[in-house]
Swiss-Prot record:
It comes from the Bacteria. One of its GO terms (molecular function) is 4 iron, 4 sulfur cluster binding. Keywords: 4Fe-4S, Electron transport, Iron, Iron-sulfur, Metal-binding, Nitrogen fixation, Plasmid, Repeat, Transport. One of its GO terms (biological process) is nitrogen fixation. InterPro entries: 4Fe4S_Fe-S-bd, 4Fe4S_Fe_S_CS. This is Ferredoxin-like protein in nif region. [4Fe-4S] cluster 1 binds at C10, C13, C16, C55.
């Protein structure tokens, strides 16, 4: 499984893109998106998903 970003809640601060260790988050057209083929949910590198931890808005970066 991968994560997704709820666009209607996203402030577009870009913190998640910068923090993502796998480079799965990018800005496309008018929103940040997570590429499910690249997203590792930070399982190997960290105890929790970095996008979820860094996001200033609760429940914006969620399991897909």
């Amino acid at each position: 499984m991968a994560f997704k970003i709820i666009a209607s809640q996203c402030t577009q601060c870009g913190a998640c893109e910068f923090e993502c260790p796998s480079g799965a988050i990018s800005f496309k057209t008018d929103r940040f998106v997570v590429d499910p083929k690249i997203c590792t949910e930070c399982r190997i590198e960290f105890d929790a998903p970095k996008c979820r931890a860094i996001c200033p808005m609760p429940n914006t970066c969620v399991p897909a």
